[in-house]
A protein has these predicted regions:
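Glycine-rich phosphate/pyrophosphate-binding loop and the adjoining helix
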Residues: 97-162
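Cysteine-cluster motifs in flexible loop/terminal segments that predominantly coordinate metals
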Residues: 1-27, 156-162
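A short alpha-helix capping/helix-coil boundary motif
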Residues: 2-4, 65-68, 143
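Helix-loop-strand module that forms the ligand-binding subsite of alpha/beta enzymes
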Residues: 13-105
Length: 162
């Protein structure tokens, strides 16, 4: 995971080479994102948490800003909503419109075949896909119609301890 070394501020990428930097190089090509994780101990997997921490800390915030994001979690039984809330924090702090569905974006099952039996979960995923596609079309239509993006607010930092 991210060790908070700050090297990314100087390098423009994570100091540790690998999948995070490979993914970050492709951010500009994406119109939106779907991030998903299995649930381990009522949280997103350690691998996904480490990936998201490093990606969102080291990549330029402009690469995420105003690009729609959805998060999905999958578990055998429980913990999906806690993991879902955990993953929502990343797009929530980078000005990404969060795409929702008709329920929390969770499916249940240990294997892909099991998930297909989760009729409600599969429906939630279909609605999520439709909503993501619709929002992407709305953004494109807004750009074509000349609707300006919101102006960038100047950075303001506050420490809680003074």
């Amino acid at each position: 995971g991210c060790i908070g070394c700050g090297a990314c501020a100087k390098l423009g990428r994570c100091a540790f080479d690998g999948v995070v930097n490979e993914f970050a190089e492709k951010l500009g090509e994406a119109d939106g994102f779907v991030f998903g994780s299995p649930v381990h101990y009522a949280a997103a997997s350690g691998n996904m948490t480490a990936f998201m921490d490093r990606l969102f800390y080291s990549a330029p915030k402009e690469a995420f800003c105003r690009k729609p994001a959805a998060v999905i979690t999958s578990a055998r039984r429980a913990g999906t909503t806690a993991a879902y809330e955990q993953l929502l924090k990343y797009p929530g702090i980078t000005e990404m419109p969060i795409v929702s569905s008709c329920y929390w974006n969770n499916v249940h099952g240990s294997r892909a075949e099991d998930i297909q039996q989760d009729e409600e979960g599969v429906r939630i995923m279909r609605v999520l896909g439709h909503n993501m596609a619709w929002l992407l079309r709305c953004i494109e239509a807004g750009k074509a119609a000349g609707v300006p993006e919101p102006r960038k607010e100047p950075l303001a930092r506050t420490n809680f301890i003074r």
